[in-house]
Amino acid sequence: GHLLVEALVARGIDTVFGVPGESYLAVLDGLHEHRDRIRFIACRHAGGAAFMAEAQGKLTGWPGVCFVTRGPGASNAAIGLHTACQDSTPMILFVGQVASDQRDREAFQELDYRQVFGPGTLGMAKWVGEVHEASRLPEYVARAFHTAMQGRPGPVVLVLPEDMLTTATPAPVLPSIQVAQAWPAPGALIELRRLLLQARQPFVIVGGSGWTAE
């Protein structure tokens, strides 16, 4: 859990949102340990926490981070995840999961999150990953940030089995990603300018992601 928190801090995350749950107690312990560098905003409902993370991502252009527990925590966060997908907002939803040795045994509130949030949902998340080796946790976090930011921004779900958060590992925190900025081709901008100048009553709807001060 501490390794995950350190990976978030290394990527410039100073605020995360969530509803505390027993499925990711090790992360909460890490957040408390590093409370001078990262703030955990405890919410009363997972849907509200997801919306806060979505707003954070939308306003900053860097992934908003939300932690929820398994089962109802994840399902309640779905509305915020869907909003992030529809609005092209970078966001990462971390979901607690039953321990690996309890999978497929009808453990308490166990769900298959690749089925819940995966491609078959048509607009819920860009990628759903689940950590199966504690030593690969930094790799999964790095991929989550990369996927959320590259191309069309959007939400990512990373599932955290309990034992993956409590297993000691010497794995180092991976460096932060460098996001490639997408720009229109010069020819397309010239054509856009020509069309606007020719228009008698130009009307522009400005929205979506990727807008900066420049």
Predicted feature descriptions by range:
Residues 1-214:
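N-terminal alpha/beta PP-like core and its mobile active-site loop of ThDP/TPP-dependent enzymes
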